[in-house]
A protein has these predicted regions:
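Small-residue-enriched hydrophobic alpha-helices in membranes
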Residues: 1-7, 13-192
Length: 192
């Protein structure tokens, strides 16, 4: 909750759209809403201290073999933070710096961070190669394999099976749409 609130404040102000996005990403049982609101309101006062929250979260969820693999809670949380950052229709340099620092703390690989940014940042169609995490010079079969791996990892049914809240599954659906659109653009562009 605190990290999401600090993300919303990263550009200097918390908008209604960001609060709505926060509620879509983080499922809070009705019995905990008052306490969660207090934590959110305290945390959104200032961005300072976000690194400590990120470190604690990373320590709780990082697995030894893959600090932020495709099935990682940390990756799901990063996707949620991107969603909050882009909720107001603008993506500010301060938000980018915040997310980049959190990604480093989470152990997120740079290419995966770029793919997430390409999927979420508003303003023009994302680079389809960045969305799929492949080099533009890769052959079509390599691109297809990357697309299939992303679809498998992102499929909403798989997310539900992992116990991800339904609200977060909406993010997976948007992510899957971006992945499929990237594959379609590449395939069409190459005449396949």
């Amino acid at each position: 909750i605190a990290l999401g609130a600090k993300m919303a404040k990263a550009d200097g102000r918390v908008t209604r759209d960001e609060v709505t996005a926060f509620r879509e990403v983080f499922h809070i049982p009705p019995s905990d809403e008052r306490a969660a609101a207090r934590v959110f309101n305290l945390a959104r006062e200032d961005v300072a201290g976000f690194e400590d929250y990120a470190k604690r979260i990373a320590a709780m969820f990082r697995s030894n073999d893959k600090p932020c693999g495709q099935d990682s809670v940390l990756c799901d949380l990063m996707e949620g933070l991107f969603y909050i950052a882009a909720a107001d229709g603008a993506y500010h340099p301060e938000e980018d710096a915040f997310l980049e620092r959190v990604a480093v703390i989470f152990g997120l690989d740079g290419a995966l961070f770029e793919r997430m940014r390409a999927r979420h940042v508003p303003g023009g169609p994302p680079d389809p190669y960045a969305v799929l995490g492949v080099d533009p010079r890769a052959d079509l079969e390599t691109v297809r394999q990357a697309w299939r791996a992303e679809v498998r990892a992102t499929h909403p049914d798989r997310m539900l099976a992992r116990g991800i809240p339904e609200e977060a599954v909406k993010l997976a659906e948007a992510r899957l749409s971006a992945i499929n659109a990237a594959w379609d653009r590449i395939r069409t562009g190459r005449g396949a």
